[in-house]
Every structure is written in structure tokens, then in C-alpha cells.
Amino acid sequence: MNKFDEFIESNEKDLDVDTSTRNSIISMSPVRKTGRKIRSASSNGYRLEHHRTSSAGSMHSQRLMTPTRLNDQDHPLQAKPDARRVVTRHSSVSVPNAMSKRRSLIQPMVVPTTPESQNNLPSVSHSEGSYGIPLESTTVLSSEQAMASGLRRSRNGSSQSVNSMIATTIPTNGVDVSALLQSLATKELELLECKQKIEDLKKQTQHEEQNYTRRARELHELKEQVSKHLDPSLNTPVKNRAFSPVYQNIPLESRTENAGNSSLPSSVSKPKNMGHQSTNQSRSVSPQDIQERRQRDDSSDSSKQSLWSKPLALFNQFDKIIQHEIERTLNWDDSLSGTPEVQEGTPTSNSESSAQQYDNEAPGARQKSPSQGSVSRSLWSFVSDVKAGLLGIEEENDNDVITDNRCDPVYKSDRQHEQKKSTHKITNRGQAEDSGDDSSLNTRKFKTTTKFQKDNAGNNSLTDESGHRTREKKSKRSSNKLSFIGEPDNDNSSVKNSVEMTDF
């Protein structure tokens, strides 16, 4: 035997303990030839086999436990009498602690004491002291009683809460202030909860709206991508689309001006545009968009202007038009009055000069817009009518004075003045008749009866160096009775016959 094994056996005999059943399975004892089987006198119903091996051996000991007898005395947890003594000594010390722990674990929740529970507690203690009920049974009974008392208290509390609610709904003289304050606090809490729910719902709606806008944007982008893939214009060669970036770089205003000022016929522009219609479909700017942008710009500019800017501009324009027309007429009258002899001698030259003056004034008039030209024509027609009426009144007054005084020089000067004023109103037919043209023999001039009689009283005709006949011109004013001048019978005199309007 090994010394280590001898030492273990001696200790086991002294302590009367089998270490092979309590220690680990592995042992350091050497292997014996016959193998040792230990069967303790204090076997507990199991056959214990323990094979010891040396430290040098490779075989480990293995414990085999096989039940042999099943009796209450041979129970594996039951120990020897000495062992029971030791165990009871240790258990006697640890039992109160264990019971206290069990009591703390089994004890229910602490509830406020009521008169019923206080009456139950002394009876429990009395039963414990007098009748000798074990501790475990008393703890179970106390827990059951505590649960029953808790249920009764919960019922009482619910009934009290119902009564308090009834008291709040139907106020009486003896209402408790604490109950009112409690109900007030509960109402405030309910209102706060409602507000919180409303705020949460608002936040949720905002979040949903943001999600909706984001998804709508994504949908729009997807539609654009699909349209790009399906649009055949994007699959055309680059040569057909080379002009589009240049067209995009041109400012919008210049494009609209070029579109408005284009004078090419539509038949020429259509074939050119038909080839590029598909390519410009997605990139070109439609005229409706241009008009809308112009209207927006005009509205913004008009809103920026003051309220008095338009009336002042209109008055200034009206003043300029009247001033221009009056200056033109005054300069024309001055030029005609500066050279009366030339105008009287050569009426054709007067027509040529008037035509040249019209040609010189035409470019200025052509530069005006159609609206300005129509306004100027209407204004000038009104001014000319007023002027003609004023001159007619002045002329009649002058003629009345001359007939009363019978002064030939004054009458002649008056006739010359009338000739100057009426030279710019001579028609082409009248000029042709004065020049002796054959095509104007059938033309006739109408004069009033009173003026015809005044002409007969004075010197009615003048002759020039070449012997041709010239007639003095008078402006025609408002009258009901008219007369015409007949064709000349000879070179020296002319026959003048007065007729009524009915004869004509």
C-alpha cells in the first residue's frame, strides 16, 4: 500500500467517514492487483464501488451507484446516529433563521390596519400560544386573513370613491373640501391628457403630411424619369438637338422680341419648324408662357409705379401732340405768307412744295405707333374744325366792314389774306383748273349768294404778264344757298350764274 492510502484509511477510521462517497471521482491512489471494493457499514442503500489508480496509471476511478433496497431506514439522506447528532446540532442553530426567511417571503403586501384586522391579530397570537399550532400554519393563516382583509378594504375603498363622486356631482352643505380638491385635480389631469393627445395628433398629422409631400415629389421624379425613357425625342441624334442649348442660353426677352418682330411668312417658317418640332417639344418655351410672364412683369411694374404717373404721362403726351401740330401748322402758314407772289403765280409749285413737305414730315409720322397716329389725327381734325369755324366768323365780320366802307384797297388786302389762309385747302382738281388743264373743265366750285354779290361789287379778276386769267380764291363757309362758277367762254371774261340748291 501507498503511504497516502494508508493515511486516508486511518483518517477514515478515526472519523468514521467514508471519503470515497463524498470526495471527487478522481483519486491519486495507485492501482492494485486485485482491485479494492469498499463497502461501508453505513451504506445507505447504494452499492458504492470505487477503483483507485495510481498517479502514474492512466485509468481513473469511477463511481457506480446502483440501488439495492428501498426502505425508510435505508434512505440515502438518512445518516448514522452520530451523524444525526451533529446534523441536529447544526440544524437547531439554523432553523430560526430559515423560518424567519420563509416568513418574510410568504408575508403578503403591507396593508393599512383596520378594526377587523386588529381583532384578528390577537386571536392568531392566542392560537399560537395556547393551542400550539406550528409556525408554518400560522403564517399561512395570517397571509390568508391579510388577503381577505385587503379585498374587503378594496371593496370599501371603491364604495367610498363612488360615494365621493356622487357627492361631487350633487353638492350639499356638508361637502368635504378634500374631495372637491381631489376631483378638481382629476379633472385637470384629464384636461392635460386631452391636450397632450391633441398635440400628439397634430404632430402625427404634420409627420404624415411631410411623408405625403415627400412621396409626391418622388412620384413626380419617377414620372419624369419614365417620360425621359419613353420620349422618342431624347433618342434622336445629337445633330438635330445641337441648337437647343444655344436657344436655352438666349435670354427670354430677346427671344420674345425676335418672335414678335419676325416678318417672315408662316409658309416659310412652318417647314423649318416641322423638322425640329419634336426636339423643341420638351425644351422650347410656349408663347402662352411668354405672355403670362410678360403680364406678370407688367403687373409688377405697374404696382411699383405711383397712382399719378399714368395721368401725368397722358397729359404730357396730349400736350406734346398738340404743340407739335400747332408748330407745324404755324410754320407752314408763315412759309406760305412769306412768298405770296410765287404761290399765286405758280399753283403747281405750291402743290409740289406741299407734297415735298408731306414727304419730309412723313418719316416722323411713320415712326409713331398706330395708336399715336390715330390720336394725333383725331386731335388735329378737332383743332382744324375749331380753327375753320373761328376763321369763318372772322371773315364774315371783315367782309361786312369792307362793304360798308367801300374801300377797294382794304378789300383787296382782305382777299389776299383769305387767299393765304385757304391755299393749303386747295384740291388737286382746283389746282388743275387754275393751271388750265383740259381734264378739269367739268369741275365746278360753289359759293354763297351773298359772297357772289360782294365779288361783283369789287374787282373780281386779275391778269398776269402772259395774259392768262387768274381767279381769286375765297374759303367756303357754312350757308344754305350755293352757286357755281361756269366754264370760261373766252380768255378775257367768265360767266358767273347764281343758282339755288334746288336747281343743283
UniProtKB/Swiss-Prot annotation:
InterPro entries documented for this protein: Tda11
Chain positions found as Phosphoserine: S244, S286
Coiled-coil parts of chain: 179-231
Modification type Phosphothreonine: residues: T236
Span of the signal peptide: none
Biased segments, Basic residues type: 470-479
TM stretches of this protein: none
Keyword Ribosomal protein: no
UniProt feature, compositional bias: Polar residues: 257-287, 332-359, 368-377, 491-504
Entry keywords, A to Z: Coiled coil, Cytoplasm, Phosphoprotein
Bias (Basic and acidic residues): 290-301, 403-421
CC annotations in GO: cytoplasm
Stretches for region Disordered: 32-62, 252-306, 332-377, 400-504
UniProt-listed Pfam families: TDA11
Cell location: Cytoplasm
Broad class of where this protein is predominantly found: cytoplasm
The UniProt record lists the keyword rRNA-binding: no
Family, per entry: Belongs to the TDA11 family.
Protein name (database record): Topoisomerase I damage affected protein 11
Annotated source species: Saccharomyces cerevisiae (strain Lalvin EC1118 / Prise de mousse)
The gene coding this protein: TDA11
